[in-house]
Structures are given as C-alpha cells and as structure tokens.
C-alpha cells in the first residue's frame, strides 16, 4: 500500500517503481505508481476535505500540526535512518534534517501570524478589515535531496492557512514520504487533508495538469521548473511557486583572513551533502597571486582527506554517494567536458563504486565560455581573477540567482559585493549552504519565480481579502452629482 488517498492506504495501478540505495544498489522500497485516475481521486479527496478543514479555527489546525511535530521529534532516528538508506547521506546529517523539520513548524506558525494577520481599523466611518483566506487544494512536489525537510516547508504553511494538499515526492525517495505521511495519520489529521501519490514523470504530469488544484509548490531542477512555468503561463487562476537550483558563485577576496578558516568555509560550501544542495558553491573565484595559490594548494590537500562512505560506516563519512549511478556519471561527464574545454583538474573526481564520487576541483580559468550549468554534485570550478570588480562581474554571469558568497575581512569589499551581486541568499564569511529558516529562501532568474519558501511561504498559501464594512447602508449627507433620491 503505497498511496494515501482520502485517509486510506492503497496500492498503485501504474508501473512498478523502486527506490535503490545509492551506496549498495539494494532495493529499499518498491511499489506501483499512481495512475492519472488515482491522482484525480487524490485531488478530489483534497477538495472534499478542504470544505471542513478551512472551517477549523486556526488553533485547532495548529494542535494537529504540533502533534505531528512531536511525533517527528520522537521518531527522529527512524526518519533519519530511512533518509540515509534512500539518499546515502551520512546518518549524522539526516538526523539534522529531521530536527530541521520540527524547527520549521515553529517558524511556520509564527510566519502565519506575522505574514497573514487579521487586521481591523476605522476610516471615515467605515470598518476596514484585512483577512486572509486559503487558496484551496495545493499540489506539493518534493525533491530527493531533502525529502523530509523541503516538502515539510511547503506542506505545513499550506495546512496552517487552511489548504489541503496532494504530495508527489521524488520517485527516488518514496519511502521517506510514506514514513512521514504515517506520522501525519498518527497525529490525527482528518482524512483527505493530505494525500500522497507516488510515481515518476507520468504521475507528476497528471498532478500538475489536474483541474482541481489551486496552486503548485515545486522544489527541484530548473529544467522541470521551467516546464511547469510554461504549462501554467496561460492559467492565471492557479498559483505557482518554483524553488529551483543555482550555479552559485563564491568569491575569495585577497583579504580572506585565516587560511584554514577560509578552506573550511569552502569545503562546507562545495562538498556538504556530496554537493547535492541547491545552494552549494559551484564556482570559486580566487585572486591571482601567491596567497591565492597557497589557498588552493591547501584546499586540495583537505579535499583529498574527505571521508566518503556509506551513511552508517564506522569511520563516520563527511560525504555519501550521489543519489544514483546516473547522477554520478553526470558529474564525471561534466568534469570530462570541462577538461576538454581547457580546464585543468587540481583534484580529479573519481568513481568509487555504486553512486560514489570523490570530490573534484577543476581550474576553469582558461575555459573560454564556461557552461552555465548546475553540476549537482561534488565538482567545484575554480576561476582566477585580478580585481574584486572583475570577480563580481564573473560571478553574476549566470542565468541563476540562488546563492552567492564573499570571504573577506574587508568591510568595504562586503559593501561593494552585497550592492552589486545578484542572488537571493548572499553570505559573508559563512558557507553558501547556510540559510536561516526564518529568512526567505529563493532567488531571481532561473532559480525561481520570486516566491521564496521558508518563512515567506505563508505569503502564497493564503490570499488577502480586503473589506470595507458598515452595520447598515447609509445615505450620505450630500448625494453624488446627477443623482436624486
């Protein structure tokens, strides 16, 4: 039973899908995907449940959601174990993901009150009221890299606002969503308020094109996001929020400070989660000169020592595998392409079996036209530069705009950088992958459609309703010209 529709666990009627552990290729989950008819049933169940769910006082919805948060906290190790088995991420890291799910719930509750409040005021004898109302049925598309945390960051704000949800997780991490949906069921969520449909492209297309949805919250690749954007472009009646990737630049100033700290910040930016975070550094701009040379030497030395292994290894790894063998091959092919274009490998990424890839660092300074691609893995491109102005210009030479960073102890350099860089998340002397849960998460360009998630998800899970009210109709002291009563 792999789908949760209208409160019932049911089998799919579509093609068989499997979740393969990327570190040993074992099948960890198997089921049949949802057909178009089953997707329509899930949307219909959500529509039916919406009528009663939106009527519930906010406090009643909050009680259930906080009960879910308590269950997530209680089952942290179980959730983390499943995520590790599906994604290959180290167990220590997946435990932090489960913890982040709990933290995001508290943030979302606060955001609901701060971003979508009820307000009243008097003006010229009228009562002016601002209310917020749920959109209706929200389709949520989840990614594989944070299969618990990222869908949670859309589902919870949607439910708090009074919406109902149909979740379509990544076909590479179905088990995680199944485990989490069972916690929602245990928390006492009414039937149909959340529905789970598993499947690959066909299931996703059926959900995205379903007439019964009022909005779609997407986290995933830019290619898929752009397809959805084109699909929804003629349908202004549906809300679309896209959270996509980035070709993220990290600029190392000549005044980068202590070498070891700078190296640590680069490692955390480029290779955490085996490079499978949308905010990971993809391009590293390093100043020409002795200090930059020495920094790169040390960076390569440290990157060589990164422990890469399966998530539960006795020698605790920093990095796990890529999500799949195909994803691992993509990184190795990208490296080969950059080498063919004139790039020089400072540390060559290598296959370590199954979906494992070791860290790669390639000097792409001599590549005439650096491909503007998101290499979603442990491959860092280095470009040497003369001036900060040149570095910022190069950093902005991308269609993306998710994250960017500057490593510098010079305040004036930071002021210049933050003024001229084009990105939604901009950090100084901190890893690019660091972001506050109560700050907007998103960026311009191909990284999204200006609907950032996290704290700001409340903005597009409810629409504002403005009212001008009086206890009874009134006749003004002076009628409008040309009117007689």
Curated annotation (Swiss-Prot):
Pfam family, one: Aldedh
Reaction catalyzed: N-succinyl-L-glutamate 5-semialdehyde + NAD(+) + H2O = N-succinyl-L-glutamate + NADH + 2 H(+)
Stated name of the protein: N-succinylglutamate 5-semialdehyde dehydrogenase
UniProtKB keywords: Arginine metabolism, NAD, Oxidoreductase
PANTHER family assigned to the protein according to its UniProt record, in alphabetical order: ALDEHYDE DEHYDROGENASE-RELATED
Domain of life where this protein originates: Bacteria
Annotated catalytic residues: 243, 278
Membership in a protein family: Belongs to the aldehyde dehydrogenase family. AstD subfamily.
EC number(s) from the headed UniProt entry: 1.2.1.71
GO biological process, one term: arginine catabolic process to glutamate
Pathway(s) it belongs to: Amino-acid degradation; L-arginine degradation via AST pathway; L-glutamate and succinate from L-arginine: step 4/5
Function: Catalyzes the NAD-dependent reduction of succinylglutamate semialdehyde into succinylglutamate.
One GO molecular-function entry: succinylglutamate-semialdehyde dehydrogenase activity
Keyword Flavoprotein: no
Binding residues annotated for NAD(+), in chain numbering: 220-225
InterPro entries in the record: Ald_DH/histidinol_DH, Ald_DH_C, Ald_DH_CS_CYS, Ald_DH_CS_GLU, Ald_DH_N, Aldehyde_DH_dom, SuccinylGlu_semiald_DH_AstD
NCBIfam families linked to this entry: arg_catab_astD, PRK09457.1
HAMAP family associated with the record: Aldedh_AstD
């Amino acid at each position: 039973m792999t789908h949760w529709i209208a409160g019932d666990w049911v089998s799919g009627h579509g093609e068989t899908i499997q979740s393969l552990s990327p570190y040993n290729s074992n099948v960890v989950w198997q089921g049949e995907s949802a057909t178009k008819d089953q997707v329509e049933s899930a949307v219909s169940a959500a529509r039916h449940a919406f009528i009663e769910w939106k009527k519930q006082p906010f406090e009643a919805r909050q009680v259930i959601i906080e009960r879910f948060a308590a269950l997530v906290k209680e089952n942290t190790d179980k959730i983390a174990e499943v995520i590790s088995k599906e994604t290959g991420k180290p167990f220590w890291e997946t435990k932090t993901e489960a913890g982040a799910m709990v933290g995001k719930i508290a943030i979302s509750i606060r955001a609901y009150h701060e971003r979508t409040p009820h307000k009243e005021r008097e003006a010229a004898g009228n009562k002016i009221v601002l209310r917020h109302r749920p959109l209706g049925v929200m389709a949520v598309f989840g990614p594989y890299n944070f299969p618990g945390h990222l869908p949670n960051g859309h589902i919870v704000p949607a439910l708090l606002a009074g919406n109902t949800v149909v979740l379509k997780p990544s076909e590479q991490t179905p088990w995680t969503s199944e485990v989490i949906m069972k916690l929602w069921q245990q928390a006492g969520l009414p039937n149909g308020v959340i529905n789970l449909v598993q499947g690959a492209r066909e299931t996703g297309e059926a959900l995205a094109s379903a007439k019964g949805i009022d909005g779609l919250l997407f986290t995933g690749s830019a290619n898929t996001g752009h397809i959805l954007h084109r699909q929804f472009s003629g349908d202004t009646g549906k809300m679309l929020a896209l959270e996509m990737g980035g070709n993220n630049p990290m600029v190392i100033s000549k005044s980068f400070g202590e070498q070891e700290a700078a190296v640590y910040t680069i490692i955390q930016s480029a290779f955490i989660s085996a490079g499978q975070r949308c905010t990971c550094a993809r391009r590293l701009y390093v100043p020409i000169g002795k200090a930059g040379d020495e920094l790169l030497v040390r960076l390569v030395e440290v990157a060589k020592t990164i422990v890469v292994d399966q998530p539960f290894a006795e020698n605790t790894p920093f990095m796990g595998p890529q999500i799949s063998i195909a994803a691992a091959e993509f990184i190795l092919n990208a490296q080969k392409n950059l080498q063919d274009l004139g790039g020089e490998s400072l540390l060559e990424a290598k296959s370590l079996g199954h979906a494992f890839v070791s860290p790669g660092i390639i000097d792409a300074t001599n590549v005439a036209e650096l491909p503007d691609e998101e290499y979603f893995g442990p491959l860092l491109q280095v470009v040497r530069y003369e001036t900060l102005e040149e570095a910022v210009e190069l950093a902005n030479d991308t269609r993306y705009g998710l994250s960017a960073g500057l490593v510098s102890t010079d305040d004036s350099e930071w002021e210049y950088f933050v003024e001229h860089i084009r990105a939604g998340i901009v950090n100084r002397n901190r890893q690019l992958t660091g972001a506050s849960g109560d700050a907007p998460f998103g960026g311009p360009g191909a990284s999204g459609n200006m609907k950032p998630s996290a704290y700001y998800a409340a903005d597009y899970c409810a629409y504002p309703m403005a009212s001008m009210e009086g206890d009874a109709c009134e006749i003004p002291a002076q009628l409008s010209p040309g009117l007689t009563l």
